Amino acid sequence: MTDHALLLVNLGSPDSPEVADVRRYLDQFLMDPYVIDLPWPLRRLLVSLILRKRPEQSAHAYASIWWPEGSPLIALSRRLQEAVQAHWHEGPVELAMRYGNLSIEAALNRLAEEGVRRVTLAPLYPQFADSTVTTVVEETRRVLRASGLTLELRVLEPFFARPEYLDALARSAGPHLQQGFDHLLLSFHGLPERHLRKADPSGRHCLGSADCCREAPVEVLARCYRAQCLRSAEGFARRMGLDEGRWSVSFQSRLGRARWISPYTEEQLDALAARGVKRLLVMCPAFVTDCIETLEEIGQRGREQFQAAGGEELILVPCLNDHPAWASALAQLCRTPG
């Protein structure tokens, strides 16, 4: 092996679906100022209120999707790590999580001990958001400063419109679409609207008009999560030859009372059923790995909601996970990260 390593970083998971482990994980996640962007005293107060009931509720959700080998997100991420290593001959491929175990610090220390000099950091998020990409990059830089490790760091930029990502998405999802469907819903993770405004380098473009995402100039597009989600959806639809009326975009996983980007997935599930859609396919392109937001929120609760509203079938299309096309594409993306 040579001295150029990859560090794949995903979100993370509790160690188990037990309430205590879920509480510990949620506390670390929600106290990240990039996730809840409030001053520390207010953030601490809000998170303490959330942790009164949320750990028990989330523990039940985690238990419903937990695998014999543990967290699906962790298990699938490990499989991806192994698959990418088969395509990356420049050095070792390491895996870390932003929250919970498999810390970024431990991964960087292992790489340094192996004699690695260069690291390409790959946040496993196709679209940019401070609460995903920025927090991974900043935590990695913090660890490097604090530890004194002299590793040359490169960062994989968001790859929402890169052909490698979209082609892998098409190859992974294609067989599921060929089974037939009435409608395809592309459900992306949501964000509070204030996060978009905060990330807008112009200070005035985001959410300024109904078509702001489609009209976003290059410098705004580079930091606008919603605009990037729409570009990903459109790129995928073109590759699959989907007519405009057969697919749509929504945003899931709202937390709290603040206004989040819309349309909301839970509202779209009811609306599509009311429109007469019987066989609904749902993809979650903001997630490269299946996790609680896909398997439980969409695959269980979303399915129940859609059927209760009059739909017949909701089929959750698996994420990219460790699909061979994705493993190859990710290695190629990391060779040209900028």
Swiss-Prot record:
GO cellular component labels: cytoplasm
The protein's Enzyme Commission number: 4.98.1.1
Example GO BP: heme biosynthetic process
InterPro entries, per the entry: Ferrochelatase, Ferrochelatase_C, Ferrochelatase_N
Binding positions (Fe cation): 189, 293
Keyword tags: Cytoplasm, Heme biosynthesis, Iron, Lyase, Metal-binding, Porphyrin biosynthesis
EC class of the enzyme, as a word: lyase
GO molecular function terms noted in the UniProt entry: ferrochelatase activity; metal ion binding
Pfam families cross-referenced by the UniProt entry: Ferrochelatase
Pathway per the UniProt entry: Porphyrin-containing compound metabolism; protoheme biosynthesis; protoheme from protoporphyrin-IX: step 1/1
Gene3D superfamilies: 3.40.50.1400
Presence of the UniProt keyword Signal in the record: no
Reaction(s) the record says it catalyses: heme b + 2 H(+) = protoporphyrin IX + Fe(2+)
Location in the cell: Cytoplasm
Biological role stated in the UniProt entry: Catalyzes the ferrous insertion into protoporphyrin IX.
Protein family membership: Belongs to the ferrochelatase family.
Name under which the protein is recorded: Ferrochelatase
Organism: Azotobacter vinelandii (strain DJ / ATCC BAA-1303)
Gene that this sequence comes from: hemH
